[in-house]
Amino acid sequence: MKRLYIIALFVFAGGFASAQENGNRDAQNRIVRGPYETNRFFDNVFVGVAGGVNLYFGENDSEGKFGKRLAPAMDIHVGKWFTPSIGARVGYAGLQAKGWTSAGTLYAKSADGGLFREKFGVMYLHADAMWNFSNAVSGYKESRTWNFVPFVGVGWARSYGNDAHDNEIGFDAGLLNVVRLCSSLDLTLEA
């Protein structure tokens, strides 16, 4: 019975979703794709700020309490859409990480039942290439409510604390779910 309800939900939801996408169609009801007018450098620029919680996964972190592993996180980025489907951004992600280790390390402090608590700063300066899948498949529509944007990137990852630091090259990939709130403000859920 549950399956029947779920299937019915998807069938009916699909009908409503397609009914909302008619603003970028021509007289024959085909999706309009380009040509796109190019713009000046500072057109289609965006800025993002986010906050959250970091949860560090290390070798012995399952031994420590969950609440003591949570640390503050921050994300700031600036980007530009070059076409309705292709964009790029540069940004900072990080702030702090907490965890547990079985041996004294550069970032470890006090012992707790044979384990050492670690607390250190983290930062990731990165550049990402973004592809707006919604615009690529369904054509550009300025008033679209939801955009699905996969991205890949590369950057500099740094951990620091207790007079020690570590630098690495990092790679990232993810998905942006962009929900339009008004013409100048979006809510973005990033995974």
Please give the residue ranges for each predicted region.
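Outer-membrane beta-barrel domain signature
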Residues: S62, M74-D75, K80, Y92-G94, ...
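Solenoidal tandem-repeat scaffolds enriched in leucines and small polar residues
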Residues: R180, S184-A191
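Membrane-embedded beta-strand positions of outer-membrane beta-barrel proteins
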Residues: V47-G51, V78, I86, V90, ...
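Gram-negative (and chloroplast) outer-membrane scaffold detector with strong preference
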Residues: S85-F171, L181-S183
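Bacterial Sec-dependent N-terminal signal peptides
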Residues: M1-D26
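Residue-level signature of outer-membrane beta-barrel architecture
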Residues: V53, K80, W131-N135, N177-V179
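Short glycine/proline- and aromatic-enriched beta-strand/turn motifs that initiate or cap beta-hairpins
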Residues: Q20-G79, G161-A164
